[in-house]
């Protein structure tokens, strides 16, 4: 389903002075994207299914070498070839923790057509500020959707620091306060007569290869600090529905429409319930833990498998990050988009269960 992005950009990007490169395979594509960024050209690559798995080694390399980059993964039903023309939200775990070693990634998601326009700008801002690859999770449902939208804000930037605050706020973000780097003493290539060293080996602040224990520990601490910089800039997503309800339904990505409509339908029927939708799915806001612990029950609605014994990927992530007893209310892995009726029925069944 990532082909829809390729088709659109092949038509439109050359008009804006850009170019589209269709590489021979997924590994070459992500390598070309990182090489372009190293040369000073903002770039991104798109993929789906097993192609996202093939990109993981280069994404780990980019984290170690502090190369910016943006990857859009249009999720489909899996694993393996699975159902290429069906939708799912089952790549969350690989997006966050898919590379070997200890290096969680920053992950954004899109809920609708408008988000697809703005998400790459936010991802570019994060990637260039923190010098790290950013993943945007879409899915087949969004990638093949059409919608009438308001006029888009132009986000052509010479300097990502000039990104509009309201664009960041779509993803619950404020401008980053700090930009921790492993190699603060290295110049960008082409901007200095100094040598710019780049490697996947562990290095010190000058870019020199180092096997020293304290250097390795500091590099890990800096990578974690990049996550914390995003975490500290994140606001808890706005509550939709009854702010005094004891039950909270959480979703992310393309589940927003069905989630909000279900909450509204339940409220009209006298059910006190609230909804929360996440655009930034990792890291999560610092204040989220206390918010979730303020509810009697917290559930997720996901287009990924989950049941009473096996929490869905997003429920598992919320548990891991907040130590809150989050359970999966709807864990739908049918290949079909979530509907409000599915969520409403699950809430009613739970109330009588």
PLM regions and their residue ranges:
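Flexible, low-complexity linker and terminal segments
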Residues: 124-353
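Structured loops at beta-to-helix junctions and adjacent beta-edge loops in soluble globular domains
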Residues: 110-111, 139
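Thiamine diphosphate
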Residues: 1-105, 109-110, 341-353
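Flexible loop/turn segments at secondary-structure boundaries
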Residues: 1-5, 28-30, 52-55, 77-81, ...
